[in-house]
């Protein structure tokens, strides 16, 4: 059964009396976030290891182990390919809004896939909020450590459900 994610934003009152939308990132903040993420590329894996208190590898393995075998998989926010490089078999699509991340991820992931005899992954520049894929086109959709960076979480979740086949798996890892 499919359920549409409500589009009603969650707003919290600030000390100054204004409101903060906890589910959306403003334009200036989004641009700054992209610049900061791009700057982390050389140390991205190390930053994730520290931010997850050393649990990043375990969490990635846990997600990989729960994916359907030889599925059609979309990873939203692939970053430099840290998760995707170890995904075996199937059709793999890696989406990221930052071209520099894709430039790092593509050779890293496809080198690993080629060495295993897996088909090359497809890399797409884009965001969770506007997925450039047909409805019901993936067996699984995952987002590891990028959900916090989606500029409109409700819209991104709706889009994820739209491209997911009925009965498919949606997995989001977002450390608190």
Protein language model features and the residues they cover:
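N-terminal auxiliary segments of SAM/dcSAM-dependent transferases
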Residues: 2-32
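Class I SAM-dependent methyltransferase Rossmann-like catalytic core
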Residues: 41-53
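A short SAM/SAH-binding and catalytic strip from SAM-dependent methyltransferases
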Residues: 140-152
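A short glycine-rich, Lys/Arg-flanked "PGG" loop and its adjoining helix->strand segment in the class I
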Residues: 154-166
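Conserved beta-strand signature within the Rossmann-like core of class I S-adenosyl-L-methionine
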Residues: 168-175
């Amino acid at each position: 059964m499919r359920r549409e994610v409500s589009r009603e934003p969650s707003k919290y009152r600030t000390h100054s009396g204004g409101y903060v939308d906890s589910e959306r990132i403003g334009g200036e903040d989004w641009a700054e976030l992209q610049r900061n993420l791009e700057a982390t590329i050389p140390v991205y894996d190390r930053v994730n290891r520290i931010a997850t208190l050393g649990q990043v590898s375990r969490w990635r393995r846990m997600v990989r182990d729960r994916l359907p075998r030889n599925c059609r998989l979309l990873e939203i926010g692939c970053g430099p390919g840290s998760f995707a490089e170890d995904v075996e078999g199937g059709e793999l699509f890696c989406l990221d809004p930052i071209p520099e991340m894709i430039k790092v991820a593509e050779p890293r992931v496809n080198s690993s896939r080629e060495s295993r005899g897996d088909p090359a992954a497809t890399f797409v520049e884009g965001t969770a909020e506007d997925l450039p894929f047909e409805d019901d086109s993936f067996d699984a959709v995952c987002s590891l450590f990028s959900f916090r960076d989606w500029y409109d979480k409700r819209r991104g979740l709706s889009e994820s459900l739209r491209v997911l086949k009925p009965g498919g798996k949606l997995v989001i890892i977002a450390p608190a």
